[in-house]
């Protein structure tokens, strides 16, 4: 084997290793990437069915229903334009309330019910996740209590 052939062989092996490494990294990102959708986007069928994503908005008033087992909770998440029914089995955060901001992670079933595996509640009256605030602002339903939070988020950018 000539030195030139050896160099080409090493170069080909290095490129193959880089290609495999890049493919593994991209696959890991794709598997762990979780998008955020508002109820309006879910209603417009922009959200994937049977794939994990985050759903954010407000818990609709009068929508919280606990089932007989004490662990399963059904509620509705809204951006005041559209609503998505949510089913969650587990302990809810202490700050989970009707009319408050919530971000749920889970999957959308074919029947339109979002099955959450994790529910996060807004932790104080001035904070709302940027994605949820933007979705509510886009729907034209930003309430006066959120105005300060959204202004603070704009200043941080």
Curated annotation (Swiss-Prot):
Subcellular location: Cell inner membrane
Protein function: Heme chaperone required for the biogenesis of c-type cytochromes. Transiently binds heme delivered by CcmC and transfers the heme to apo-cytochromes in a process facilitated by CcmF and CcmH.
Membrane topology, record value: Single-pass type II membrane protein
Annotated binding of heme, by residue: 123, 127
PANTHER family per the UniProt record, alphabetical: CYTOCHROME C-TYPE BIOGENESIS PROTEIN CCME HOMOLOG, MITOCHONDRIAL
NCBIfam families: PRK13254.1-1, PRK13254.1-3, PRK13254.1-5
Positions in the Cytoplasmic compartment: 1-7
One GO cellular component term noted in the UniProt record for this chain: plasma membrane
Annotated keywords: Cell inner membrane, Cell membrane, Cytochrome c-type biogenesis, Heme, Iron, Membrane, Metal-binding, Signal-anchor, Transmembrane, Transmembrane helix
GO molecular function annotations of the record: heme binding; metal ion binding
Residue spans, topological domain Periplasmic: 29-157
Protein name, UniProt field: Cytochrome c-type biogenesis protein CcmE
Alphabetized SUPFAM superfamilies for the sequence: Heme chaperone CcmE
Record Pfam families: CcmE
Keyword Heme applies: yes
């Amino acid at each position: 084997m000539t030195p030139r052939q050896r160099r080409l062989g090493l170069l080909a092996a290095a490129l193959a290793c880089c290609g495999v490494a890049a493919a593994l990294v991209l696959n890991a990102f794709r598997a762990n990437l979780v998008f955020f959708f508002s109820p309006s986007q879910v209603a417009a069928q922009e959200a994937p069915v049977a794939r994990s994503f985050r759903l954010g908005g407000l818990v609709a008033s009068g929508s919280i229903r606990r089932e007989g087992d004490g662990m399963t909770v059904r509620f509705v998440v809204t951006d005041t334009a559209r609503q998505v029914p949510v089913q969650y089995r587990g302990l809810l955060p202490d700050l989970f309330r009707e009319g408050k901001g919530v971000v749920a992670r889970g999957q959308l079933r074919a029947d339109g019910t979002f099955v959450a595996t994790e529910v996060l509640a807004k932790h104080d009256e001035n904070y709302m996740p940027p994605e949820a605030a933007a979705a509510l602002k886009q729907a034209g339903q930003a309430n006066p209590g959120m105005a300060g939070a959204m202004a603070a988020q704009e200043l941080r950018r």
